[in-house]
Every structure is written in structure tokens, then in C-alpha cells.
């Protein structure tokens, strides 16, 4: 199939909207009722992570492991808006063989991770895979959200899986792959069922011994990794600090190269914290160190720089714990592990201690009650927040996550930056919800590493006046660096960047589908729509690379946006690189009139599914 033929994907997924919303609601009851949770009595130091964290070790019968992971997949593969959450953790050792591989599917809200200090400490001979989902005969990866793979090696042996040869990871947003070593071919699209559309994606700190097939993935970010080869681009493939990355080529050349945006190094990075088990069977959390101007993996040449924090220094929370209980533990100097589940919060979780770690296992989800802010992080150095979903509640919250109060911005040091890794926001979809802004960053020197802020376009409680949300991300701090900023469907500016010396490497956006009229969606008199990415008028320095914004206005009336990117014309020359807009479907109306300010052509029904690009601005 042509990689440019994305037109019908939006029709198929939206026509199936009611089916999607209904089919993804599941009844209660965990997998443990059918398959006993693995445990090892010899590991007396093993913490209690709750019934939805499965810990495997190589001494277990493979049939037991297979039965457990298959039972989780059977529940989660179609469970898009369910409340069940799981973490599947593998102790150091080898699982499966070339003749009897361990192959299993990863569904919604499932985190698969090795428990070694290095990705090479856990080896799976087989595959840990994702498949297309099929609705009305259309099989795509467009809604393969909220799942992850990390900290292990896969020796890709897909014996007995037919067309599915190698490692398949056809995912969309909020489905990161981190600290993974894959030996053999990897594909980011599921070409075994059609039309195979896909819209991802994020990889970091990983090594691929074999070509990665991008296929139909319309955009993707690879950061600080090592590649043997990369097959192709579609709209916006971005590589930052990647050894073996394709050469810079934007816009793409038909039957030639790209579209690729390639940066030799990443300016400042800090990998996500992760759980591991040491040689004495003691559990710890490893906190990687900050790196500057780096390329390649942190572990390829030896141990990842950083520090280990013993599990005794963590409060291990369960969904039944109140926010008051969690805050009490944080005030007494504990770090925080959030185990799988949905947490109903009657007060804000307050992270106030420097270098505090908040680590989610299995996509824990925070839901505010009474319009509160779900979590606030003080303007202090070194806080690590990773692996958490922030859902909006029934009553409007002014924000869901606040990083820094705004009046202490200098305390977050560049040498020890606060870092948000794999942090996701959702307005509606699972349950009706409202929030004016999802994420507000007031602190300086913050790293944002894989953020998806999504005002739901399908599911429960969805509508222009139902799941209301002005803005996905507001950055007020200086020296903030973002990698993989995915922000979609908000009703005003989707991103507002007010800080100086900020950098965004990769941006993916879809404008809201559902403005009911042009009059209802106007930035100002005479300015149609709202820009997807707004850089504040007073900002004197900002850099952006590989930034795309798409439109699909589906209410049957022409809706236009004057432009997708709005920035001061006084920015230094060539501050922004490789920008694009796209009119997604011939079923849509209106479009985007310019790419950035008044520069760049229009994306309308006259040029559907065709990138309109600006290589450099101003």
C-alpha cells in the first residue's frame, strides 16, 4: 500500500466511535481470579506491589508464565477505557528458547519491564508484541495507546506466528519503548492486516541490532539510541542523539530520503527512573544522571550513570490509599511508587522535597475530585516523575499537574533538573472530565520527555461543551527542554511557551475535530482559529525541531485556523526547523491557512494528506 494513503483512516475510526466507546468497557474482576499471581517464597525481601504486579523469574515453568501474560492480554487488548492496570516484571535471567519462544501480546494499561540493572540482564527469546485493532473491517494501530516496554533484551524469535516475524511494536501515543535491546528485525507498523495505519511514537535509550521498519507510522521520535538501519519516513520522523540515524532530509524527497529531522546530539537529557533487583534479591529504584550534548544509549558502554535508591526509601501506594496518606509519607521523606490502579484524589498530592522520585507502575491513573489540582511539584531541584496518567474529573480543574509555583523558579538547578518522563493527560474518554489546562511548568530547567496531553475525540463524555479544555501544556519556566510533545484536540492554544531559551524537539498535534462554527473558535477578531503552538510575544529565544500540526474538522462546516505556529518575528534567524501542516481527510472541512505566522502555504481539501512545509523560520 502507499504510505501516503492515510485518508480513509479517519473515516473508519470515527464511524466506529460508538462501537469503540461501548466495546472497551469491561466488567470488574482481575486476571488473578483465573491465573494465580506468580510469586517466589525464597524472595523474602520482595515488596508488596499489590495483586496487579506480576513478577516472573527464570525458574518458573514457561507454561505458567505464558498462561499469566496471555490472561492479562485477553483482558487488556480491547480494554481502552477500562479501569484495570497491570505491570509484568521479569527478574534477571533468560526466558524462552529459539525452539520454544516466549511470545505474548501487550494490551492497554500494561507495562512490561525487566528487573535488571542493565537491559542485557533480562533476555526474552521470542517477542513482546502489539497488533492492529480492527473495527468495521479496518485494521489499524491508531488507538494503541497506554502501554510500555522497557529495560530488557528481546532476541526476536517469532516462531509459529506466521506473518508476524520479528518484534512488532505498532503503537500510537503514550506507548514508549525505553532501555530496550532488540536483536533482529523490528517493525513499528502491523503490515499483516490492512490498511495498517499507525500514529506514534517514542523510543529512547534503546539499541536495535537489525533494521527498524517505520512503515506507515506518520511520525516518530527516536532519542539517544543506536540504530542499524531505518526504513523510511512518512511525515515527521525525528532523531535526536541517535547513533546510526538517517541523515537530515526535510522535506522528504519522493523515492529518495526522509522526511527526517536529525540532530547529532540531545542538548540535555535524563532517562526515566526504573525498578530493579540486585544480586542479593533486594529491590531498588535506579535514578539516572543528567547528561549534556549526548548521543547513543546510557548503558551500551557500561553501567548507566546515576544512583540507586533502596526500596525502603519508598512509600508503595495502592489505589485505596488516600491523598492524605500519600502526602504524609512524602512529608516524612519517602519517595513514592504508585502501583497499578485508579486513584480518586480528594486533595492535591504535594511533592516538596528535592530529588524526590515518583514512579508509576502499570499506568496508575490520578483522578481529581471537587476540581482540585491532582499533583503539585515545588520549584525544587531533581524531582523525577514517571509513568503516570492524569485524568480530568467531573468538576473542572484549573490544571491537573503543576510543576513549580512560579515565584521560586530559580531553585530547580540545571545540573539536577526536574524531569517528567512518560506523563500523560486525558480529558474525557474514560469518564467525563474537564480541566482548563493539563500541565503547567513554572520551574526553570525542567525536562519533558514523552508527554501526551489528549482532549479525547472518542469515548465517554466527549463533545465541544462536554470535555472542555483550553490548553494542554503551558511552559512559563526558562531553559525548559521537551522531547516528544504530543498535544491534541484542545480548544484554544494547545501549547503556550512563555519561557526563554526553551527547546522543543518533536511536536505532534491534531487540532480539535469538533468546533461547531468558526465564530465559536476564534483567537481574536479577524484571526481564525487558534494556533497549535504559541510562543509568547515577549520570548526572545526559543528553538524548535520537527514540529507537525494536522486538521480534521468534522462538523460539516468550514473551520479554518490562520496558522498552526505563532511566534514572535523577532526570534533569531532559523529558530524553528522543519515545520509542517496537513489536511488529514477528504471527509474534513476548512483547514489551516499558513504554517507559521503568515508564512507557508495552506492545507485544505485542495491538497489532502500532503505535508505543507517550512524548513526554517524566521
What are these regions (language model features)?
Residues 54, 58-111, 117-122, 127-129, ...:
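N-terminal extracellular ligand-recognition/capping segment immediately after the signal peptide
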Residues 36-67, 290-323:
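Right-handed parallel beta-helix/beta-solenoid
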Amino acid at each position: 500500500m502507499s504510505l501516503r494513503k492515510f485518508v480513509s483512516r479517519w473515516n473508519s475510526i470515527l464511524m466506529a466511535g460508538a462501537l469503540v466507546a461501548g466495546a472497551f468497557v469491561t466488567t470488574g474482576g482481575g486476571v488473578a481470579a483465573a491465573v494465580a499471581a506468580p510469586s517466589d517464597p525464597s524472595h523474602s525481601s520482595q515488596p508488596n506491589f499489590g495483586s496487579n504486579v506480576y513478577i516472573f523469574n527464570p525458574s518458573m515453568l514457561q507454561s505458567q508464565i505464558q498462561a499469566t501474560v496471555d490472561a492479562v492480554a485477553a483482558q487488556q487488548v480491547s480494554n481502552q477505557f477500562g479501569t484495570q492496570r497491570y505491570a509484568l516484571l521479569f527478574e534477571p535471567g533468560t526466558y524462552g528458547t529459539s525452539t520454544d519462544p516466549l511470545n505474548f501480546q501487550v494490551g492497554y494499561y500494561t507495562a512490561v519491564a525487566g528487573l535488571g540493572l542493565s537491559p542485557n540482564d533480562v533476555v526474552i527469546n521470542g517477542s513482546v508484541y502489539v497488533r492492529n485493532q480492527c473495527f468495521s473491517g479496518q485494521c489499524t494501530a491508531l488507538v494503541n495507546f497506554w502501554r510500555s516496554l522497557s529495560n530488557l533484551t528481546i532476541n526476536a524469535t517469532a516462531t509459529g506466528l506466521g506473518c508476524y516475524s520479528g518484534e512488532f511494536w505498532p503503537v500510537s501515543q503514550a506507548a514508549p519503548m525505553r532501555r530496550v535491546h532488540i536483536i533482529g528485525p523490528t517493525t513499528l507498523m502491523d503490515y499483516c492486516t490492512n490498511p495498517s495505519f499507525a500514529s506514534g511514537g517514542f523510543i529512547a535509550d534503546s539499541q536495535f541490532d537489525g533494521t527498524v521498519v517505520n512503515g506507515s507510522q506518520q511520525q516518530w521520535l527516536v532519542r539517544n539510541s543506536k540504530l542499524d538501519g531505518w526504513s523510511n519516513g512518512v511525515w515527521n520522523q525525528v532523531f535526536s542523539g541517535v547513533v546510526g540515524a538517517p541523515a537530515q532530509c526535510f522535506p522528504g524527497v519522493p523515492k529518495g530520503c526522509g522526511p527526517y529531522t536529525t540532530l547529532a546530539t540531545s542538548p540535555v537529557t535524563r532517562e526515566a527512573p526504573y525498578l530493579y533487583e540486585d544480586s542479593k534479591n533486594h529491590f531498588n529504584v535506579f535514578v539516572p544522571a543528567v547528561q549534556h550534548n549526548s548521543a547513543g544509549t546510557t548503558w551500551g558502554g557500561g553501567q548507566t550513570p546515576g544512583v540507586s535508591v533502596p526500596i525502603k526509601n519508598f512509600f508503595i501506594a495502592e489505589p485505596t490509599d488516600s491523598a492524605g496518606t500519600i502526602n504524609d509519607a512524602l512529608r516524612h521523606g519517602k519517595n513514592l511508587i504508585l502501583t497499578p490502579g485508579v486513584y480518586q484524589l480528594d486533595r492535591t498530592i504535594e511533592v516538596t522535597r528535592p530529588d524526590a522520585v515518583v514512579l508509576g507502575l502499570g499506568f496508575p491513573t490520578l483522578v481529581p475530585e471537587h476540581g482540585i489540582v491532582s499533583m503539585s511539584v515545588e520549584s525544587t531541584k531533581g524531582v523525577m516523575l514517571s509513568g503516570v496518567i492524569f485524568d480530568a474529573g467531573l468538576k473542572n480543574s484549573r490544571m491537573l499537574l503543576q510543576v513549580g509555583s512560579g515565584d521560586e523558579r530559580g531553585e530547580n538547578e540545571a545540573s539536577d533538573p526536574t524531569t517528567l518522563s512518560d506523563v500523560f493527560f486525558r480529558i474525557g474518554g474514560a469518564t467525563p472530565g474537564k480541566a482548563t489546562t493539563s500541565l503547567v511548568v513554572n520551574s526553570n530547567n525542567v525536562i519533558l520527555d514523552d508527554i501526551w496531553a489528549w482532549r479525547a475525540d472518542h469515548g465517554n463524555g466527549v463533545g465541544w461543551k462536554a470535555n472542555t479544555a483550553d490548553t494542554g501544556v503551558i511552559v512559563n519556566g526558562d531553559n525548559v527542554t521537551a522531547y516528544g510533545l504530543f498535544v491534541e484536540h484542545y480548544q484554544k492554544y494547545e501549547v503556550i511557551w512563555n519561557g526563554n531559551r526553551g527547546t522543543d524537539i518533536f511536536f505532534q498535534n491534531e487540532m480539535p475535530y469538533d468546533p461547531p462554527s468558526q465564530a465559536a473558535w476564534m483567537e481574536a477578531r479577524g484571526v481564525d482559529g487558534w494556533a497549535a503552538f504559541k510562543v509568547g510575544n515577549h520570548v526572545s529565544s526559543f528553538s524548535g525541531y520537527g514540529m507537525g500540526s494536522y486538521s480534521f474538522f468534522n462538523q460539516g462546516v468550514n473551520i479554518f485556523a490562520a496558522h498552526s505556529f505563532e511566534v514572535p518575528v523577532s526570534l533569531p534567524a532559523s529558530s524553528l526547523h522543519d515545520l509542517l501542516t496537513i489536511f488529514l481527510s477528504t471527509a474534513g472541512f476548512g483547514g489551516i491557512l499558513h504554517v507559521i505566522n503568515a508564512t507557508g502555504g495552506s492545507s485544505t481539501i485542495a491538497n489532502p494528506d500532503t505535508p505543507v512545509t517550512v524548513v526554517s523560520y524566521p
